[in-house]
UniProtKB/Swiss-Prot annotation:
This is ATP synthase gamma chain. Keywords: ATP synthesis, Cell membrane, CF(1), Hydrogen ion transport, Ion transport, Membrane, Transport. Its main location: membrane. PANTHER family: ATP SYNTHASE GAMMA CHAIN, ATP SYNTHASE SUBUNIT GAMMA, MITOCHONDRIAL. It is a peripheral membrane protein. Belongs to the ATPase gamma chain family.
C-alpha cells in the first residue's frame, strides 16, 4: 500500500510540473495573438492598395504582362506552403499540409508539375521524410516573420517566375497559408499569387472606382516595378496571418493540455487518497487483530 501511495504522489508531482509548462506556453501564445493580429491589420491596407493599383493599370492598358496574363499551356507551378517551426500547435501544420496535398493533386490533374517552397521546420521535415524534393526551404521565422523574411521567399519565387521553362522556370505561383478567422477558427486556404486573377464584373470595385493613371515611362514599366512589391506584400500578409493562426492554435492546444493535466491530477489525488485510506484501514485492522490476539492469549 505504501509503495502504491508513493507512486501516485510521484505521478501527481510529474503532472503538476507538466501543467506549469503548458500553462506558461498558453499564456505566451495568448500574448502573441494580439500582437500578431495588430501586425496583420497594419500590413493589410498596403497589400490591398497595391492590388488595386495593378487592377487599375491592367484595366487601362491592353499589354500582355506576366503579372496579369495567363500563360498558354502552363506546365509548371510553384507552391508555397507556410507551416510552423515548432510543434505543440494542434493541427495547425498538418491542416496546411493536407490543403497543400489537395492543391498539388489538382495541379497534377491539370497536367502541371509542381515545385515546392516550404516555410517552417514542420513542413520541411514532413516532405524530407517522404523523400519529396523542395526547391526552397525557409525556417526560423514562422512565429514572428519580418518583411525581410517575406522578401527572401519572394525573390526566389520571382526568379523562378521570370525564368524560362528550360531554366526551371514556373508559369504560376500558388500560396497555401492559414487564414485567421477567430481565436477558435483558423482555416487553411490556397490562393494563386501569379498571374493575378482579374475578374470582369459589372459591380463597382471594392474601395470605390479604380483610379485613372498616366504611366511614366510606360504601363509595362510600372507593372515591372510593381511585380516584386506585389509578391512581397502578399507573402508578408500571408506570413503574418499564419503567425497569428499558429499562436491561436498553440494557445488552444496548450489550454486543452492544461485542462487535461488538471483532470489527471484530480484523478491521481483521488486514487492516492483511496490508497492512503486503505493503508490506514489495514493498519487499524492489524492493530485490532493484534490486540484481540493478546486478549485471547491472556
Amino acid at each position: 500500500m505504501a509503495g502504491q501511495l508513493r507512486e501516485y504522489r510521484r505521478r501527481i508531482r510529474s503532472v503538476q510540473s507538466t501543467k506549469k509548462i503548458t500553462r506558461a506556453m498558453e499564456l505566451i501564445a495568448a500574448s502573441r495573438i494580439a500582437k500578431a493580429r495588430a501586425r496583420v491589420a497594419a500590413a493589410r491596407p498596403y497589400a490591398e492598395e497595391i492590388t488595386r493599383v495593378i487592377e487599375a493599370v491592367a484595366a487601362q492598358t491592353t499589354i500582355d504582362h506576366p503579372l496579369t496574363t495567363e500563360r498558354p499551356g502552363a506546365a509548371r507551378a510553384a507552391v508555397v506552403v507556410i507551416t510552423s517551426d515548432r510543434g505543440l500547435a494542434g493541427g495547425y501544420s498538418s491542416n496546411a499540409l493536407r490543403r497543400t496535398g489537395e492543391l498539388i493533386e489538382l495541379l497534377h490533374s491539370e497536367g502541371k508539375e509542381t515545385d515546392l517552397h516550404v516555410v517552417g521546420r514542420k513542413g520541411t521535415g514532413y516532405y524530407r521524410f517522404r523523400g519529396r524534393a523542395m526547391s526552397g526551404e525557409y525556417t526560423g521565422f514562422s512565429e514572428q516573420p519580418s518583411y525581410a523574411d517575406a522578401k527572401s521567399v519572394a525573390d526566389a519565387l520571382i526568379a523562378a517566375f521570370i525564368a524560362t521553362s528550360e531554366n526551371g522556370g514556373v508559369d504560376e505561383i500558388h500560396v497555401v497559408h492559414t487564414e485567421y478567422v477567430s481565436a477558435i477558427t483558423q482555416t487553411p486556404v490556397a490562393r494563386r499569387l501569379l498571374p493575378m486573377v482579374l475578374t470582369e464584373t459589372d459591380e463597382p470595385p471594392r474601395g470605390g472606382p479604380l483610379p485613372q493613371y498616366e504611366f511614366e515611362p510606360s504601363a509595362e514599366g510600372v507593372l515591372d516595378a510593381l511585380l516584386p512589391r506585389y509578391v512581397e506584400s502578399r507573402l508578408y500578409a500571408a506570413l503574418l496571418e499564419s503567425a497569428a493562426s499558429e499562436s491561436a492554435a498553440r494557445q488552444r492546444a496548450m489550454k486543452s493540455a492544461t485542462d487535461n493535466a488538471e483532470d489527471l491530477i484530480k484523478r491521481y489525488t483521488r486514487q492516492a487518497n483511496r490508497a492512503r485510506q486503505d493503508a490506514i484501514t489495514q493498519e487499524i485492522s492489524e492493530i485490532v487483530g493484534g490486540a484481540n490476539a493478546l486478549a485471547s492469549g491472556t
